[in-house]
Amino acid sequence: MKDTAKKPILVIMAAGMGSRFGGLKQIEAVGPAGEAILDYSLFDAHRAGFETVVFIIKHAIEDAFKSTVGARAEKAGLNVRYAYQELDILPEGFTVPEGRIKPWGTAHAISVSYTHLTLPTILRV
């Protein structure tokens, strides 16, 4: 594994369930060779000097995500890490309100990725 301690880390929030889109837009093929939109972002990030990417995903999409976007990112030479945004992963003292099913949002996503981060870090929303 490469020494990436001083290199910037790219964090990509990809835990959305695509309810408005009607599917998992994170892995939806849009390019001529089946590329997802994220593949284009990863290509540009790698060319800009990023060597590590942290994908924030849900366990529910883990297999599909890892076998598509994640696998292509690794094949391109990126050091890939995963953080999981789930409703029950909360700071001490917090609880999930009854009936809540939606993700908590950006601050929660960043909090679950914190253990993977060193400075500098770039967040792609």
Per-region residue spans from a language model:
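N-terminal glycine-rich phosphate-binding loop and ensuing alpha1 helix
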Residues: K2-A71, V80
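Feature marks short, surface-exposed loop/turn motifs that line or immediately flank catalytic pockets
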Residues: M17-G18, I89-L90, T121
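A contiguous, low-structure linker/loop signature
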Residues: G77-A83
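Conserved beta-strand termini and adjacent loop/short-helix elements that scaffold enzyme active sites
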Residues: A83-Q85, V112
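Active-site-proximal specificity loops/subdomain of glycosyltransferases
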Residues: E86-A107
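Short, conserved alpha-helix that lines the donor NDP-sugar binding/gating region
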Residues: A107-Y114
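Conserved small/polar residues in nucleotide/adenosyl-binding loops
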Residues: T115-T121
